């Protein structure tokens, strides 16, 4: 359906109180929201009877913390490392410029593809027969095409990525976690997370890139002393994707950087961690 319909957001939209930035509504100045409502409007081509199918609607509200959070102590009593396929976004550099051109532009669809691969989900090979024969991991190219935002001109739209994951019998959504302790609860349930981070030079030891204003990777586990085990798609090769990051540095890059934003992607019926007061899932 990508040939017939180009999914898109509509750029910056603003009034005196709020501003829409791609997939996020932000308040302006001192304005604060006390309640909100979501409306979905479905359209069909005039003169046809075909209609869209709406499977789920998701929205999430949050007030971002100021500055870097204090480092939380780990709750892990031993190492837990979930087996997640390793996929590098960089081996796709130069692929399909009309969908972002691979490389550094494809961290989100690459991370989404890794988690879908963990669950044994994703497109069947015939769906990506159009991908060049010499291209490794063609499901990543397919995911980039299927998540590309023709308004934003990128494949990193959070909502589009979880909507893509939901094609494959998953219950997926975007939320924010408050700390690595909450992420540990998902890992103990066997649920890897796609996390949004940003950091400056020297702020994340062992990262395959020196800095980033916005990047997505997979949290696949924790060491016994609380360090973060990640699949970082910015590695040059698939073999270098698995990384282990210092707990405090990662928390600053994730909670301090994006407010703890994650994609939660898991099969339908897979239980989430038990909810706590003010739960965010």
Regions found by a protein language model. Give the residues of each.
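A generic signature of intrinsically disordered, low-complexity regions enriched in glycine/proline
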Residues: 27, 96-99, 165, 235-236
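Active-site-adjacent structural segments surrounding the nucleophilic cysteine of cysteine proteases
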Residues: 29, 35-154, 280-281
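Catalytic micro-motifs at enzyme active sites that drive phosphoryl/nucleotidyl and oxygen chemistry
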Residues: 24-27, 206
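Extended, solvent-exposed segments with strong compositional bias
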Residues: 1-23
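Noncatalytic regulatory segments and standalone regulatory/sensor domains
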Residues: 2, 9-11, 30-82, 222-281
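Conserved active-site-adjacent core of cysteine acyl-enzyme catalytic domains
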Residues: 130-281
């Amino acid at each position: 359906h990508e040939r017939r319909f180009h999914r898109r957001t509509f750029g910056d939209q603003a009034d005196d109180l709020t501003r829409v930035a791609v997939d996020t509504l932000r308040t302006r100045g001192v304005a604060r929201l006390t309640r909100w409502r979501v409306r979905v409007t479905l359209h069909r081509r005039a003169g046809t009877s075909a209609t869209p199918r709406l499977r789920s609607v998701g929205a999430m509200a949050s007030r971002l913390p100021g500055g870097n959070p204090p480092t939380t102590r780990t709750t892990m009593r031993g190492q837990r490392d979930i087996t997640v396929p390793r996929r590098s976004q960089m081996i796709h550099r130069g692929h399909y410029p009309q969908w972002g051109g691979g490389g550094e532009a494809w961290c989100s669809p690459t991370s989404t593809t890794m988690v879908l691969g963990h669950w044994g989900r994703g497109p069947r090979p015939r769906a990506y027969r159009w991908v060049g024969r010499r291209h490794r991991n063609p499901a990543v190219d397919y995911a980039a095409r299927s998540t590309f935002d023709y308004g934003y001109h990128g494949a990193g739209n959070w909502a589009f990525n979880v909507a893509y994951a939901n094609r494959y019998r998953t219950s997926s959504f975007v939320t924010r976690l408050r700390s690595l302790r909450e992420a540990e609860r998902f890992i103990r349930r066997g649920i890897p997370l796609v996390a949004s981070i940003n950091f400056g030079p020297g702020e994340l030891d062992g990262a395959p890139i020196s800095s980033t204003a916005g990047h997505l990777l997979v949290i696949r586990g924790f060491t016994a002393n609380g360090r973060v085990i990640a699949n970082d798609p910015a590695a040059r090769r698939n073999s270098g994707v698995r990384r282990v990051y210092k707990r405090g540095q990662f928390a600053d890059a994730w909670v301090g950087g994006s407010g703890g934003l994650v994609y939660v992607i898991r099969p339908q019926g897979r239980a989430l961690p038990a909810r706590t007061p003010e739960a965010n899932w």
